[in-house]
Amino acid sequence: MKKILNISNLMGKLNEITDQNFKTEVLESTKPYVVTYSALSYCQPCIQLHKILKNEIINHPISEKVNFGTVAVEDKGINISSQAGVRGVPTTIIYKNGEKISEKVGSVRSQIFIDWVQSAIV
């Protein structure tokens, strides 16, 4: 019988963050958490950033040091988006030890994003 390798175990993943799981998933995480608040149904910069996260960032070695998640501001993340002070999308916030430590608004190239995350979590 041929064994199938589950490639998702070898790289990071992009977790869905909702109003219901935000506290346990993000604030109580033992690793820093990079959370992108976006509106994928209508926001082109959000779609662009989501593709970069999904295709490049979570496969980068940085994903071993941090968790990545995305919040749908128009759906399951309305309350946490408001509580986080999100005023525009995409907004990415880095949380460490339950606290917001850095914030970036807009979409950026993958290397700029990685450099920003690395500098924030040291």
What are these regions (language model features)?
Residues 23, 44, 74, 101:
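Nucleotide phosphate-binding site architecture
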Residues 79-89:
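Structural alpha/beta surface segment adjacent to cysteine/selenocysteine redox centers
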Residues 43-46, 92:
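The canonical Cys-X-X-Cys-His
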Residues 30, 38-42, 88:
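Short pre-active-site segment immediately N-terminal to redox-active cysteine/selenocysteine motifs
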Residues 88-122:
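Non-catalytic, surface beta->alpha helical segment in thiol-disulfide oxidoreductase systems
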Residues 15-18, 37-39, 50, 54-78:
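Thiol-based oxidoreductase modules, predominantly thioredoxin-like and allied folds used
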Residues 2-12, 47-51, 70-71, 83-84, ...:
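Chalcogenol-based redox active-site neighborhoods
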Residues 1-33, 110-122:
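N-terminal leader/targeting and pre-domain segments
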